[in-house]
C-alpha cells in the first residue's frame, strides 16, 4: 500500500536529514526534506504511536528527536483541542465580517502578491503546502490582506489533504 511505501521511504532516506532540512520549502516538485506522511497521519492510516515506535526501533532518539518532537506536538495539540470543544464550536459558528472582493482575490490567487498567489495555486492543485509556507500564507492572509483567520482556516481545510483543525 502507498502509505507503507511512503513511510518506509522516509524512514530509510529522509529521516536522517529531516532536522537540518525540514524548514525549507523547495517547491511542490521537491519534498524530500519533509516526511510526506501528514495526509496518512491526519486520516489515521498511519498511527503516531506506531510511527514513533517503528522509528525508534531503528534509530536512537538523539538522531531523530526533531521528527519525534513534531509528532508529539501534533498529538499535544489534538488533545488540547479535544479538551476545549468550545474552541471548535466558536470557529464553526463564527461569522466574521470581511471584504468579499478581497476574499475572492485571495482564494483565486489574484492578490498581486506573487508568492501568495503561487501558494494559492499550489494549494488548489497539490492539496498541500509546506509547514512554513502555511505560516507565511496565514501571516499575509491576516496582516496584509486583512482577512479573518477563520476564512483562511476554512480555505485550508477545504483543500489540504492533511488538513487538521488542531495542527493548522
Residue ranges and their predicted role:
Residues 1-165:
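Structured secondary-structure scaffolds
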Amino acid at each position: 500500500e502507498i502509505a507503507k511505501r511512503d513511510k518506509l521511504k522516509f524512514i530509510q532516506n529522509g529521516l536522517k536529514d529531516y532536522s537540518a532540512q525540514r524548514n525549507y520549502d523547495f517547491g511542490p516538485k521537491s519534498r524530500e526534506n519533509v516526511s510526506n506522511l501528514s495526509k496518512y497521519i491526519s486520516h489515521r492510516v498511519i498511527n503516531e504511536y506506531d510511527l514513533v515506535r517503528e522509528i525508534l526501533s531503528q534509530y536512537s532518539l538523539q538522531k531523530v528527536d526533531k521528527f519525534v518532537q513534531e509528532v508529539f506536538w501534533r498529538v499535544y495539540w489534538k488533545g488540547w483541542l479535544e479538551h476545549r470543544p468550545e474552541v471548535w464550536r466558536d470557529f464553526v459558528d463564527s461569522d466574521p465580517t470581511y471584504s468579499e472582493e478581497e476574499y475572492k482575490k485571495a482564494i483565486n490567487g489574484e492578490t498581486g502578491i506573487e508568492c501568495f498567489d503561487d501558494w494559492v495555486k499550489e494549494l488548489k492543485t497539490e492539496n498541500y503546502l509546506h509547514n512554513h509556507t502555511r505560516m507565511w500564507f496565514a501571516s499575509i492572509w491576516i496582516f496584509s490582506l486583512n482577512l479573518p483567520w477563520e476564512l483562511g482556516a476554512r480555505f485550508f481545510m477545504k483543500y489540504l489533504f492533511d488538513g487538521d483543525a488542531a495542527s493548522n
